Amino acid sequence: MPSSWGKIFRVSTFGESHGTSVGVVVDGVPAGLPFPEEEIQKDLTRRRPGQNDLTTPRDEKDRMVVESGVFEGKTTGSPILMKVNNQNTIGSDYDEMAHVFRPSHADYTYSEKYGHRAHVGGGRSSVRETIGRVAAAGLARVILENELGISTVGFVDSIGPIDSNITEDEYPISRDLVDQFPTRCPKASANEEMETLIRKLRDEGDSVGGVVKVVVRNLPPGLGDPVYDKLDADLAKAILSISACKGFEVGSGFSGTRQTGSTHNDEFYIEEGTGKVKTRTNRSGGIQGGISNGMDLVIRAAFKPTSTIKKEQKTINDQNKETILKAKGRHDPCVLPRAVPIVEAVVNLVLVDAYLYQRALQPKWFMKYANLNAIPNQ
């Protein structure tokens, strides 16, 4: 079961929902980097369960433990192991699911592929796997912010039929603003409607999906490679690997198919004062030909409704007999509020790997775009 990602900044996650712990081993972190323990813990707290009544009532504090790769507050260049101990597990909630497959869940496909599965909490298919990715991305964010000045902010763009209707004119949106709203939709009117919808469906034993939008500012041109290692292809694979994610788009995405070339093309110009190459619109979402073009990277990720719900559903068991399931346990009625820091994290993991790869292969590019004073041991 593959559990690793990256060429240079390599991330390997481990653990299961109801196991002893979940975590990550990160290879390729440069030595001498100040270890951002407090910032990583803040990121983990943003994604943890039990934040409010819109999320699962499972109350995990998700306190990080660092076991290697850090000495006297700085990275050593050796693999960094970070983990979180699972503390609030109730395995008996899943007794019925030992032999019954939840509709639209990974239960059936894991069983068919491996012939044996950890049914409690969904095992590796649980969103708790992303704890390791969020922890690793805390390191990635330090590199990206310090060396390139990059800012990555995500927010909930829609839940069910309710759209945020946030436009580019309202950028930049700060993480502090996003976190003021329980749904992480930074538009007060839409947030209120979303809260009402989530609570209604939760009380009915149902769930709802939606879309997370992420905007990356100050991304330099040149990241990504043509054909098979395109930046948008890497982002798509990484983001679609998040539990419950079913769709991905960059820039105009599918809506661009409704336009003509003359209306969709992003015209270039030279920015007065800086001499930088810019585009008058950003329908490309910051990527052209699989390579960043210096404009904001704009992506959207679609999440399906949580598959484990308390309403009765028709399904089958592992004896190929039809049956009825009314799931027990503690589950998110909507994953979107907690998905925001997860999608941000995955975006940063892809970007830091692309940056370190470009930095190694293209010294002239590195000298042109990186803040050399922020790089340890230089």
UniProtKB/Swiss-Prot annotation:
Its EC number is 4.2.3.5. It catalyses: 5-O-(1-carboxyvinyl)-3-phosphoshikimate = chorismate + phosphate. Pfam families: Chorismate_synt. SUPFAM superfamilies: Chorismate synthase, AroC (SSF103263). InterPro entries: Chorismate_synth, Chorismate_synth_AroC_sf, Chorismate_synthase_CS. Gene3D superfamilies: Chorismate synthase AroC. PROSITE patterns: CHORISMATE_SYNTHASE_1 (PS00787), CHORISMATE_SYNTHASE_3 (PS00789). One of its GO terms (molecular function) is chorismate synthase activity. NADP(+) binds at R47. It comes from the Bacteria. GO terms for cellular component: cytosol. Residues 37-60 are annotated as: Disordered. Reduced FMN (FMNH(2)). Keywords: Amino-acid biosynthesis, Aromatic amino acid biosynthesis, FAD, Flavoprotein, FMN, Lyase, NADP. GO terms for biological process: amino acid biosynthetic process; aromatic amino acid family biosynthetic process; chorismate biosynthetic process. Its cofactor is FMNH2. FMN binds at R124, S125, S126, G289, K304, P305, T306, S307, T308, R330. Belongs to the chorismate synthase family. PANTHER family: CHORISMATE SYNTHASE. HAMAP family: Chorismate_synth (MF_00300). Homotetramer. This reaction introduces a second double bond into the aromatic ring system. This is Chorismate synthase.
